[in-house]
Amino acid sequence: MTARLRPELAGLPVYVPGKTVPGAIKLASNETVFGPLPSVRAAIDRATDTVNRYPDNGCVQLKAALARHLGPDFAPEHVAVGCGSVSLCQQLVQVTASVGDEVVFGWRSFELYPPQVRVAGAIPIQVPLTDHTFDLYAMLATVTDRTRLIFVCNPNNPTSTVVGPDALARFVEAVPAHILIAIDEAYVEYIRDGMRPDSLGLVRAHNNVVVLRTFSKAYGLAGLRIGYAIGHPDVITALDKVYVPFTVSSIGQAAAIASLDAADELLARTDTVVAERARVSAELRAAGFTLPPSQANFVWLPLGSRTQDFVEQAADARIVVRPYGTDGVRVTVAAPEENDAFLRFARRWRSDQ
């Protein structure tokens, strides 16, 4: 006889991360190719001296540093810290939704939204994208008296697109004030072309808006798992109530604080990624691919039924990309030489079609 487990888990898949194949070029996980700055490495080294002690469970110094980084309108009580922004997504579901409640988001989007909602016993309302972008009008039309939470993944993972700043502001105004809106900005540092929303302004103006950000992408700390939420103190207090104690390590906290101190230098690196993104996108289009305009550190190839063939042939060429069923492939913008290898493969594959 086996233990009796919750029936909601029976149909849920186990999360499968982007593959790592020794000797292959990994373009599957949207990691930065840049390692930590010397000042961040030094902070990490110093933090190892106290790993025999539990970390600061309240992340007091990190919250204070984040509040300073966000500006004079924010204080530590506006900030929650988690083990990556994905854990904060889970916490948001926990504090808003229970059995029979609804959580709205565009689809396809971050693939952990549906299982996180189902584990809570709530119902995921997956609204089809329009032109690979969140359709905010369609999402608004799905709101009912059972809606508790709305995720807006912006830029959207995996399709790389953003919603317009004005459209997002109008959407927030239109959503009933008792429904929490989570703007998931894991890739916000890569937005250009005047498409970056004033999400912090939305937090200031609306008590039901929370913004999620991470140190995993532009800051290059994916292995240390640090994310944070910005919102009304009541929302932040609720998130802290369901935070699993001590899950943000002392090393991660120290690295994040040092990264904020070096934010200008770290964020300048995103310009290099954006330039490569433009080059990769242009060369893919020249080769005959169709792809939406990217505002992230990856591109989206909507290959449909050809997705699996592309992924398998890429693997044969020692290049690992991220498939999404029969929808398409997400490809990280990496170092120039890695991008060149991918482009050579992509041209060969396209010429064989």
From Swiss-Prot:
Its EC number is 2.6.1.57. One of its GO terms (molecular function) is L-phenylalanine-2-oxoglutarate transaminase activity. Its cofactor is pyridoxal 5'-phosphate. It catalyses: an aromatic L-alpha-amino acid + 2-oxoglutarate = an aromatic oxo-acid + L-glutamate; L-phenylalanine + 2-oxoglutarate = 3-phenylpyruvate + L-glutamate. Disulfide bonds: none annotated. It is an enzyme of class 2 (transferase). The modification N6-(pyridoxal phosphate)lysine is found at residue 217. Gene3D superfamilies: Aspartate Aminotransferase, domain 1, Type I PLP-dependent aspartate aminotransferase-like (Major domain). Keywords: Aminotransferase, Pyridoxal phosphate, Transferase. One of its GO terms (biological process) is L-histidine biosynthetic process. Homodimer. The hydrophobic nature of both the substrate binding pocket and the N-terminal lid is responsible for the discrimination of a polar substrate such as histidinol phosphate, while facilitating the binding of Phe and other aromatic residues such as Tyr and Trp. Belongs to the class-II pyridoxal-phosphate-dependent aminotransferase family. Aminotransferase that catalyzes the conversion of aromatic amino acids and 2-oxoglutarate into corresponding aromatic oxo acids and L-glutamate. Shows excellent activity with phenylalanine, and lower activity with tyrosine and tryptophan. Has no significant activity with histidinol phosphate. This is Aromatic amino acid aminotransferase. The gene is pat.
